[in-house]
Amino acid sequence: MFERNQKTIFVLDHTRYFSIASEEYISMDFLKGKPSAHSSAGGSSQFSKSLWTCACESSIEYCRVVWDLFPGKKHVRFIVSDTAAHIVNTWSASTQNMSHVMNAMVMVGVPSRSMPQSSDYSVIHGLRAAIEALAEPTDEQSQAMASGIPDDLILNEGRVICITSARDNTSMKSLEDIFNTVLIQQNVLSATPPKKGLGINHCHLVILNIVPLGIDSMVTNRNLLEISPLLDVEIHTVGAPDISYKLTHLILDHYDLASTTVTNIPMKEEQNANSSANYDVEILHSRRAHSITCGPDFSLPTSIKQGATYETVTLKWCTPRGCGSADLQPCLGQFLVTPVDVTSRPSSCLINFLLNGRSVLLEMPRKTGSKATSHMLSARGGEIFIHSLCITRSCMDEAPSIADGPGGRVNDYRTSELGQLMKMSRMVPLKSRDPAAPNLPRRLPRYFPLTTTSTVLFHLQRHLSWLPHFLHLLVKEMDKQDEVRCQQHIHELYKSASRGDVLPFTHTNGARLKPHKAKDQYRLLYRELEQLIQLNASTVHHKNLLESLQTLRAAYGDAPSKSEAGTVNLRSFTESPLSPERLEAMSNVSISSSTNSNSLLKASKRRMSNCGTRSLLDIISSAERSQSNKRLDFSGRICTPIGQIAKLYPDFGNKEKDAAAAAAASGVGVAPKE
């Protein structure tokens, strides 16, 4: 309800040091043409802002952005510290505006250089007042307290941004310790009666140590650090001319904002009305304007502006259109917009262009190289919004066809069977408890191939009269008669395989089953039958049927391997033995000779049962083994026992054998030695 960024307090150091110049000189030569030699040499037409002016301008610009994007929701206060703390505004809505703050800052004025150097001038007075201001409730918190919500349940967090200048890290450490001590004391005062304000749940202290341009500081930067459960502190050292960039960078994180630069804005030249030039305008808005638009096909073009340390998204200006309802595209969200440099001529021209009722479309590039209109700028009721347009498929578009999936067009899905399965599996609320409810999940199908060409069993159920009844019994309760009838059907199937009958396939849809022989088709059918029964073996009759099928496979020389007899892989719920990896193994069976068909078939079955755990190394190794099995190994490896070294050319150099071979060639016998 109450976020940390609801309360922000600026503590500005108003000591003598802030009266010195920032050493960034601005030219005052407004005459046309080249500057005179006297002005260039003497430098009389240049001036430099003081550290106080840089701090005031950047902090007021910070609160302008907050009040533009969150009108009436986020609160910013200012406290000026010298010999005492001077309160510039309060949490009241009447003082939360630019005119009140700027008039008060004019009355404060720049610190005087004749101010005495005394220990009474310190930023600590402002830090104490900031903690007291955090304990004061805002209008929203006061309403919550009036509605009866306990004070402990009202979250009170805030952020303090202190702009000062310290000598070294020791001075910064003392500021942290003093702030933490005062914070704890304030919570003690808020907890004890009479209560003085709300307790502070957490505070985020940001210390900006600013120095003139070209001066090295002995204070080191430090990221966010938790000092205590109540306090987080971060320190930034920055040059006075760059403090506005630093605060713009910080506000992006403080309020979850994003920066967008509209590029290539055509604008008439001020000095020559007949020509035009392209300008850029940077705007700030909620980060969600980009996050809800981008999809996987889009990338945000980002860049870093000169002098800044944060990224800005670059979007290109498109041809302006009317702001009618017919021209609007599907919109995902709209967010308020404010320019970064509100006083520049390009920003004022863009704002006036939008306030006159025109709209601007913005483009972003795709990964493919083309562009898409992703955002639109328009104004309503005197406020400018950025609209995030839908550049991907929206909910109003028709859903893509299930056939147009990855890997090509698939047109053999079992759509009607899937519809029947969904109707059978629908859930209906019951008034009373059903005693058979625990057994219902067991009766649901656990094996459902998605396509017709990935299964043999369900492909044949329209052509074998007994198969639909067989499949129905597998998922239902089975008695002894059903078990005997199913065993008879399995025996008839094996007899048909022994006779060499071909399975009644009406079509193969792309000749996916052509490489298989009739025997291999039956083996695929047996394997799928066993897999289906094994997944639904919940009763004694199902288990008896599974044992009889395995016994028949062993009797016909098609016994399952050890790995096949293990647990069924989870992928088998939606796959069949005709999945791509298994088809490759079956193709090798039909191509190889009949002598090696048994071993290759068993190897393919092992691959079928373990397909879910195969790696790329396993696939390459199995392919190399299948190639090496096609040729005989060397005789030395075959005849030599394991662990011994085979002798190369064992008959080479044997004189008796050489003489016998020569005599045999000449027809003369050689008597053996006694």
From Swiss-Prot:
Q: Which GO terms describe its biological process?
A: cell division; centrosome localization; dorsal appendage formation; flagellated sperm motility; meiotic cell cycle; oocyte nucleus localization involved in oocyte dorsal/ventral axis specification; posterior mRNA localization involved in anterior/posterior axis specification; regulation of fertilization
The record's annotation in InterPro entries points to: Cell_cycle_regulator_Mat89Bb (IPR019355)
Q: How is it modified after translation?
A: Phosphorylated.
Q: List the disulfide bonds.
A: none
User: This protein's superkingdom?
Assistant: Eukaryota
Q: Which UniProt keywords apply?
A: Cell cycle, Cell division, Coiled coil, Cytoplasm, Developmental protein, Differentiation, Meiosis, Mitosis, Nucleus, Phosphoprotein, Spermatogenesis
* Similarity section: Belongs to the Integrator subunit 13 family.
Coiled-coil stretches, from where to where?
Answer: 516-538
Which Pfam families does this UniProt record tie to the protein? Mat89Bb
Gene it is expressed from: asun
Subunit info here reads: Belongs to the multiprotein complex Integrator, at least composed of IntS1, IntS2, IntS3, IntS4, omd/IntS5, IntS6, defl/IntS7, IntS8, IntS9, IntS10, IntS11, IntS12, asun/IntS13, IntS14 and IntS15. The core complex associates with protein phosphatase 2A subunits mts/PP2A and Pp2A-29B, to form the Integrator-PP2A (INTAC) complex.
**Localization, UniProt:** Nucleus; Cytoplasm; Cytoplasm, Perinuclear region
Free-text function comment from the UniProt entry? Component of the integrator complex, a multiprotein complex that terminates RNA polymerase II (Pol II) transcription in the promoter-proximal region of genes. The integrator complex provides a quality checkpoint during transcription elongation by driving premature transcription termination of transcripts that are unfavorably configured for transcriptional elongation: the complex terminates transcription by (1) catalyzing dephosphorylation of the C-terminal domain (CTD) of Pol II subunit Polr2A/Rbp1 and Spt5, and (2) degrading the exiting nascent RNA transcript via endonuclease activity.
Residue ranges annotated as motif Nuclear localization signal (NLS) = 601-607
In Swiss-Prot or TrEMBL terms, this protein is called: Protein asunder
- Organism (species): Drosophila persimilis (Fruit fly)
| Any one GO cellular component localisation term in the record | integrator complex
